[in-house]
Amino acid sequence: MKKLTGVFETKKKNGQSYYRSSITYKGRHISLGSFDISEDAHNAYLEADKILHSSDVYQIDLLESYFPAADTSPKKKKKSFAKIDFLSFEKVVILLNFRDNDIYFHSPIYLYKNFFHYYLSPDYHLTFDKEDLFYYSSHKIMRRGNHLFVADYGMQVTIASRYGIRNFAVKDRDYRFINQDDTDYRYSNIEIINPYHGVLREGSFGNYSYRVLIHINGNYIVGIYDNIETAAIAYNKAADLCHQYGINKKFPVNYIENLSPKMYADIYSSVSVSDSLISMLTSGCNQ
């Protein structure tokens, strides 16, 4: 049988044959995937060859059209003249980026001058600043529903947490995307409104106050404060009081990095919490 270009036959442990597909471009040997049928492996090679040498047909902005959805109408399918059947969308992104930018990544990243896109599907990508390139080129982003995360040293790390967005933070209350695009994780596009647990900013145009709530059996008002650091410390103090009065609950702790230990202690000792919270704790209603 004639050897097919770009195809290498190999064996599984049980002796069954399968076929690896690869291509060499700009001096780099690129694996395209493994296939059960040699013709499929060869077709993957042919698709890769067309992508790498047909920049007028294959472009990153047209990625979605190369992978039409299964329920796409026949009319729309007809327009998808460059449909990809054998390569994964991740591999197509990798090839397009290597062709256009001369940089090979193992992740589905397409590089622009000051930012890059990380593709999670043909029609969905995230935008990041270039300074995050090293991290995301070596960490695979996964999506479960609206939950975006990477595996980092065996731990799940949410994408949002890397940008100061706390777990359970509410969009447009605790943080916001300035351009309204919640796939754009460039630092200039993320505004953290409430960086501390239990602290809610109120007011507008720089005239802000900070309401503090603590959740026990529902939310209790700790107080309203003039600055965010005092509010964050008030939350910590309220949590400590809850523990002192026998509430066995793990409250998050606010860390205020710009205060010295002495400044923190001074504010902690002087800050007040609401009479209603103290009354609830001392009356035993928390039991």
What is each model feature region?
Residues M1-Q287:
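Boundary-flanking segments of nucleic-acid-binding domains in nuclear regulatory proteins
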